[in-house]
Design a protein with these regions (language model features):
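Short, well-ordered coil/turn segments that N-cap beta-strands
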Residues: 1-3, 47-49, 78-83, 110-116, ...
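Flexible, glycine-rich active-site loops centered on histidine and acidic residues
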Residues: 2-30, 90-160, 203-217, 264, ...
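An alpha-helical appendage that flanks or caps ligand/catalytic pockets
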Residues: 5-9, 136-172, 214-335, 373-383
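Glycine-rich, proline-tolerant flexible connector loops at the mouths of alpha/beta enzymes
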Residues: 49-70, 89-91, 123, 209-211, ...
């Protein structure tokens, strides 16, 4: 298993110290400055990939709405760490596929081939704001957009004609550095999406939020089974990516009492409660009745404070502890088939210096032991 990082660029917790808009500006600037410093340090420490999300309108949760700009800056200020789009929102209402081909390839050129390209459809709250269909048409758009992007990369000139989109023959530039193109991933929150990723030859990006490791393992098994049955003619790309990446909150500390004193557990609790609050307010009203019935029982108890932080810890939904304790939990993820653990390290009100120390501990005491265990998947394969 390899250790990655995932950044949503979450501003420090409200209330901010100054009135609007100055408090928001200050909080977001600080978030960016600290995150970039952490990523540059992780590059030196030997972390594998940093993934930057694309989110829109995520009040207090994410200030990362333009991941290509962040990754372009990181391409010029890091030297080893891979740069992950985590993920590009692909339905046509968000962006034209030609723009996706351009921005992903540009970061790949700037970084000399360090891009990992994650793709997804987003959530109803974001889709509605951009005029994206809230039904399965967004899935069709997502798939079609990937075909278009890869076609642009692979051909000197390219044209497209379909019910959803048409454009005349044009040359897309620049082409990506990697040959034939960067590996492609699919964000998957359900078993159905995990199966889709396996069938299409895409890497799987998932999470361990509000579900025990055993439940996550079911998604991975469904992905692996679909992958084993996949036919070359069904692949969306020329790079077969059979890796699994999973994200969760990760923090390593020297001393548990000290960590409690600097607010570690309050930050975990806030992060989960804010997730529940945001989802129930902005996402739930836009879901189908069946989806609401599935989501509401999970989130309302979290919002009401009925789920103690110890529950997440005991179920290994989060990876927090000394370096040795973190390693023990990480090995559980390794054993169920996770190839890359996306460590979500900037959350709540964690002090920047403690995040930096956590990165040090993981690099010194966890990464070498994971390397010694070996890797199921060393690279993607061209087809």
């Amino acid at each position: 298993m390899k250790l990655d990082l995932l950044y949503e660029f979450q501003p420090k917790i409200k209330p901010w110290t100054k009135p609007h808009p100055y408090g928001q500006r200050e909080a977001e600037q600080r978030t960016y400055d600290e995150a970039i410093a952490e990523i540059q340090y992780a590059d030196k420490l030997g972390f594998n990939t940093v993934w930057c999300v694309e989110h829109h309108f995520r009040d207090g949760r994410s200030a990362s709405s333009c991941s290509e700009a962040i990754l372009g800056g990181l391409a010029l200020s890091t030297s080893q760490i891979k740069l992950g789009f985590g993920v590009t929102l692909m339905p046509f209402g968000f962006i034209h596929p030609a723009r996706v081909a351009e921005k992903v390839a540009t970061v790949d050129v700037l970084s000399h081939g360090r891009v990992e390209w994650g793709t997804g459809r987003s959530t109803p709250m974001e889709q509605a704001a951009f005029g994206v269909p809230l039904d399965d048409r967004s899935r069709d758009h997502w798939r079609e957009a990937i075909e278009i992007v890869v076609g642009m990369w692979e051909n000197e000139t390219f044209a497209w004609e379909s019910e959803n989109l048409s454009f005349p023959e044009r040359m897309q530039t620049p082409k990506p550095f990697q040959d034939p193109h960067p590996p492609v991933w699919q964000a998957a929150a359900t078993v159905k999406s995990a199966v889709s990723a396996g069938e299409l030859g895409l890497g799987l990006l998932s999470f361990a939020l509000l579900q025990p490791v055993e439940k996550m393992a079911e998604h991975i098994q469904a992905y692996r089974s679909a992958q084993a049955m996949a036919r070359p003619q069904d692949m969306l790309t020329r790079v077969r990516n059979n890796r699994v990446g999973v994200y969760t909150l990760v923090h390593a500390y020297d001393d548990g009492d000290e960590a409690a004193a600097y607010g570690l557990w309050e930050s975990v609790n806030w992060w989960y409660k804010h997730l529940a609050e945001f989802t129930l307010r902005w996402e739930l009203p836009m879901l189908s009745e069946a989806e609401q019935q599935a989501v509401f029982p999970l989130l309302q108890p979290v919002l009401d404070g009925q789920v103690p932080v110890s529950h997440y810890q005991e179920q290994d939904m989060i990876i927090i502890g000394t370096a040795d304790e973190c390693l023990e939990k990480i090995i559980r993820y390794d054993e169920v088939g996770v190839d890359q653990l996306l460590c979500y390290v900037q959350f709540g009100d964690l002090p920047h210096d403690k995040v930096m120390r956590s990165l040090e501990l993981l690099a010194q005491h966890v990464i070498p032991k994971l390397e010694a265990r070996g890797h199921r998947v060393e690279a993607t394969a061209s087809i």
